[in-house]
């Protein structure tokens, strides 16, 4: 159990925390565009298409214990550097509001400079670090912008596609449905772009500010589709509250537009839900495959255990996760609690054009893991100069 109290500047992770505290036994209440109904577990819901057994096979790659050492390795290395240069992490940790999961909420002024972190072409377990191309950065920026639109009340629940980021990234977008749950405030929408030939499924993240937060619990729940896989109980519960609202809508859109691709995205908690949704779509909808289904997350937390991470990798579904500088959220729940990121990481190291890609499909000690435990809540609020958490 980890606790921290109010943050004087920046955002709290209020909705993220509510999901972290939400157990699988919670009673979910959800609704589509203002209506309300009771949702049940996605894994047990007869209204959903059945699981495709061949798409739920446990991963053959069992990984290694070293996969869970990337973050602890850098925490020790960077803490030693910090203390050898006169810093005192022990004094920072004396107040619960300074650390969460061992990570700093507010960056110390004398933290190790980010320039000491991984550089391009450096080797690590399972891949290398390369510089993102201009085209790749434009793509990452686009999905950060689309994820930001979910914070606009005019979009969810307003059903209006008229915000600044809306018109910038998908000018011909048509909202098919919005969805929301009352218990965990899970929100999102399904959007179609005929020019881009794309069906978007977008989840809203955290947007509550300056609140007191205590007793974050990192509980696992069995991930029923895949033997041995476990995911965060709160993330799964919050996701399951809305699956009935969006799933048939995506299916209807695929039937009407069979050549369109499906892209799932979200920021913060929305990133966790996007990953779960992407896997659910792949496991139940035979028309979707790595050729027409992709997942892009922005500042998303860790979702599951190593078996879940290796399973996501084994599906072949393209999964790109973007992390801004020292954003703390991608480092919770901590690796030390048994959580592991799947996906190719794109790390905004500085500015908006210095972006590194860790090519491994499982997180390594490079990219954003290279700066722990010196993280910051402020870097969670902006990606590629796009405000995340507010509609601007």
From Swiss-Prot:
pH dependence statement: Optimum pH is 6.0-6.5.
Region annotation (Disordered) ranges: 50-69
Lineage: superkingdom: Eukaryota
Catalytic reaction annotation: a triacylglycerol + H2O = a diacylglycerol + a fatty acid + H(+)
Enzyme Commission number(s): 3.1.1.3
Location(s), subcellular: Secreted, Extracellular space
Effect of residue 313 to V: Increases the optimum temperature to 50 degrees Celsius
Regulation: Lipase activity is maximal at a lipid-water interface (interfacial activation), probably by an induced conformational change that results in an increased accessibility of the active site to the substrate.
Keywords, sorted A to Z: Calcium, Cleavage on pair of basic residues, Disulfide bond, Hydrolase, Lipid degradation, Lipid metabolism, Metal-binding, Secreted, Signal
Gene Ontology molecular function terms on file: metal ion binding; triacylglycerol lipase activity
Cysteine pairs bridged by disulfides in the record: 152-391, 163-166, 358-367
GO CC, alphabetical: extracellular region
Annotated Ca(2+) binding sites: 379
Key word Manganese present: no
Top EC class of this enzyme: hydrolase
Positions of the catalytic residues: 268, 327, 380
Pro-peptide region(s): 27-95
Signal peptide region: 1-26
InterPro entries assigned to the protein according to its UniProt record, in alphabetical order: AB_hydrolase_fold (IPR029058), Fungal_lipase-type (IPR002921), Sec_MonoDiacylglyc_Lipase (IPR051218)
A biological process from GO: lipid catabolic process
UniProt main location, coarse: secreted
Note: Limited proteolysis produces a smaller peptide starting at residue Ser-124, that has altered substrate specificity and biophysicochemical properties.
Function field: Hydrolyzes ester bonds of triglycerides as well as of their derived partial glycerides with a strong 1,3-positional specificity.
Family the UniProt entry places it in: Belongs to the AB hydrolase superfamily. Lipase family.
UniProt-recorded name of the protein: Lipase
Native organism: Rhizopus niveus
């Amino acid at each position: 159990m980890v606790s921290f109290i109010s943050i004087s500047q920046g955002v709290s992770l209020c909705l993220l925390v509510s999901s972290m505290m939400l157990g699988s036994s919670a009673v979910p209440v959800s609704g589509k565009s203002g209506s309300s109904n009771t949702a049940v577990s996605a894994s047990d819901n007869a209204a959903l298409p059945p699981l495709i057994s061949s798409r739920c096979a446990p991963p053959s790659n069992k990984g290694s214990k070293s996969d869970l050492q990337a973050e602890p390795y850098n925490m020790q290395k960077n803490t030693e550097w910090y203390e050898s240069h006169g810093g005192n992490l022990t004094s920072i940790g004396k107040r619960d509001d300074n650390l969460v999961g061992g990570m700093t909420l507010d960056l110390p002024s004398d933290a190790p400079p980010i320039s000491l972190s991984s550089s391009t072409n450096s080797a690590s377990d399972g891949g290398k670090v390369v510089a993102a191309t201009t085209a790749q950065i434009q793509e990452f920026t686009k999905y950060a912008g689309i994820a930001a639109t979910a914070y606009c009340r005019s979009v969810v629940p307003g059903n209006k596609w008229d915000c600044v980021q809306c018109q910038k990234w998908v000018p011909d977008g048509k909202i098919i449905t919005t969805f929301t749950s009352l218990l965990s405030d899970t929100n999102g929408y399904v959007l179609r772009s005929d020019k881009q030939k794309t069906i978007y499924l977008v989840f809203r993240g955290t947007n509550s500010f300056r609140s007191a937060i205590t007793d974050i619990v990192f509980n696992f729940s069995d991930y029923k589709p895949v033997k041995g896989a476990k995911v965060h109980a709160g993330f799964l519960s919050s996701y399951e509250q809305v699956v009935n609202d969006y799933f048939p809508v995506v299916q209807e859109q695929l039937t009407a537009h069979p050549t369109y691709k499906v892209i799932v995205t979200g920021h913060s908690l929305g990133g966790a839900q996007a990953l779960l949704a992407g896997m659910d779509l792949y496991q139940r909808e035979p028309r979707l495959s790595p050729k027409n289904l992709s997942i892009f997350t922005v500042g998303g937390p860790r979702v599951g255990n190593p078996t879940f991470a290796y399973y996501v990798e084994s599906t072949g579904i393209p999964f790109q996760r973007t992390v801004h500088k020292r954003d703390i959220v991608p480092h919770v729940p901590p690796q030390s609690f048994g959580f592991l990121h799947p996906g190719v990481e794109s790390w905004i190291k500085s500015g908006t054009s210095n972006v590194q890609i860790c090519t491994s499909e499982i997180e390594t000690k490079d990219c954003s893991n290279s700066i722990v435990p010196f993280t910051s809540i402020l870097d969670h609020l902006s990606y590629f100069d796009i405000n995340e958490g507010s509609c601007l």
